[in-house]
Amino acid sequence: QDLENDKEIQHVFVSLHTPFFPNGGHLTDDMWYKGNNEPRPYIAGKAVDKGILERRDELLEILVNQSTKVKALLTGDEHNYAKTFISNATPIYPAEYSLDKIELKRSIWQINNGSAGAPYYAQEKTPWSAMVSNFSTQNVVVLFHVAGKKIKMEVVNPITFELVDELEF
């Protein structure tokens, strides 16, 4: 709440290792486990009561629904670059999921930049594949240019200086 009330802070970028929505290389783990909610995260050596998808949704509730300032989720576990648009229209559950489903109040971008890792991971089919607007196994650097309320993201190959992707939000 302090963050939301602080008028000096306009934009927040949340960086974490594990993608909320993996696209290649980690569909059997990360925050998806091929849609299996049975795996439990561990805190202080003990499994928590809720499954991995439920815990993912709790994070989304905080970062997307309870905050207007979080602009992007920056991840890196997968050895690729992927830009994924997450909204309430994005399919984020397996077909047979019977537990409560989060309703996102706004959209957000997940930017995965694990492209410096090896080996590179190819894109795999997921429920949200249609929401991936760029996927690359090139080495890239992701740059954010912030000017007041405007944010411009540039994704550049650091060897060739080729512009791989860009986004304004």
Identify the residue ranges that each predicted region occupies.
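Aromatic- and acidic-residue-enriched segments that line the glycan-binding/catalytic groove
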Residues: T28-N36
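Metal-dependent phosphoesterase/phosphodiesterase active-site architecture
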Residues: Q1-V14, P19-L27, R40-L73, E78-F169
